Swiss-Prot record:
Name of the protein in question: 1-(5-phosphoribosyl)-5-[(5-phosphoribosylamino)methylideneamino] imidazole-4-carboxamide isomerase
Cellular compartment(s): Cytoplasm
GO MF assignments: 1-(5-phosphoribosyl)-5-[(5-phosphoribosylamino)methylideneamino]imidazole-4-carboxamide isomerase activity
Gene responsible for this protein: hisA
Record keywords: Amino-acid biosynthesis, Cytoplasm, Histidine biosynthesis, Isomerase
Disulfide bridges in this chain: none
Pathway listed: Amino-acid biosynthesis; L-histidine biosynthesis; L-histidine from 5-phospho-alpha-D-ribose 1-diphosphate: step 4/9
Length: 239
């Protein structure tokens, strides 16, 4: 199981939110570049990077900063937040970003996902499914659709998506443990596509449980920044 430390960017700083609430923001490192270097120096190979400003603006707000992170750190990076156009994806891939996460647009315009898969390939496109009580949330988690997370995942898999990031918004940033039942259901319902878990990880035991379920990777944020899980422990899972 791959471990992906998370860096969420808001106003140029690394932050953590509580249940996706922008009003409950904690700055964990004011220097994004320094945080990326910390991961790199610890032997981490791949990170999960979210442009929180972009989720609200609907554009690549922190594109220049993200480009600098890639250039200086040399880390493998997947980027999400505000991805609305193929041109944005082209731009990110051109500067070396490894994977692009499509979130809201998977619900609002499935043809956009199809076009992205056709142009860039399934190894470069990840669909991020964020859900509240099992229903898909969009627009930086500010809106909730009537689409069930399993239904969306199965539709996207038929389209050719091979990797999903599933976030239980109600667990994100809470340190209450991941929603294991949701991950069990999602892994069992998908035919060949893989799942990366996100939201709620609090301790090392949570990573062991997720590995047993069969997720391909897990994103770790607050548990690391709070000191619950060390970088050495993350590395032991193949981070």
């Amino acid at each position: 199981m791959q471990i992906l430390p998370a860096i969420d960017i808001k106003d140029g700083q690394a932050v953590r939110l509580f249940k996706g609430d922008f009003n409950q923001k904690t700055v964990v490192n004011p220097d994004i570049i320094e945080q990326a270097k910390t991961f790199k120096n610890a032997g981490i190979q791949f990170i999960h990077l979210v442009d929180l400003d972009g989720t609200l603006d609907g554009r690549a707000t922190n594109r220049d900063l993200i480009t600098e992170v890639k250039k200086i750190s040399g880390l493998g990076i997947e980027v999400g937040g505000g991805i609305r156009t193929l041109e944005q994806i082209r731009d990110y891939l051109a500067v070396g970003i490894d994977r692009i996460i499509i979130g809201s647009m998977a619900v609002k315009d499935p043809d956009f996902v199809r076009a992205a898969l056709e142009e860039f390939g399934a190894d470069r496109i990840v669909v991020g499914i964020d859900a509240k009580a099992g229903l898909v949330a969009t627009e930086g988690w500010l809106e909730t659709s009537n689409v069930d997370y399993i239904t969306l995942a199965k539709e996207m898999e038929k389209m050719g998506v091979t990797l999903f990031i599933y976030t239980d918004v109600d667990r994100d940033g809470t340190l209450t443990g991941p929603n294991l039942d949701h991950y069990k259901c999602l892994v069992s319902e998908l035919t060949t596509a893989k799942v990366i878990a996100s939201g709620g990880v609090a301790e090392l035991a949570d990573l062991n449980h997720l590995q047993e379920i069969g997720v391909a990777g897990t994103i770790v944020g607050k548990a690391y920044y709070n000191g619950n899980i060390t970088l050495d422990q993350l590395k032991s899972f193949g981070g």
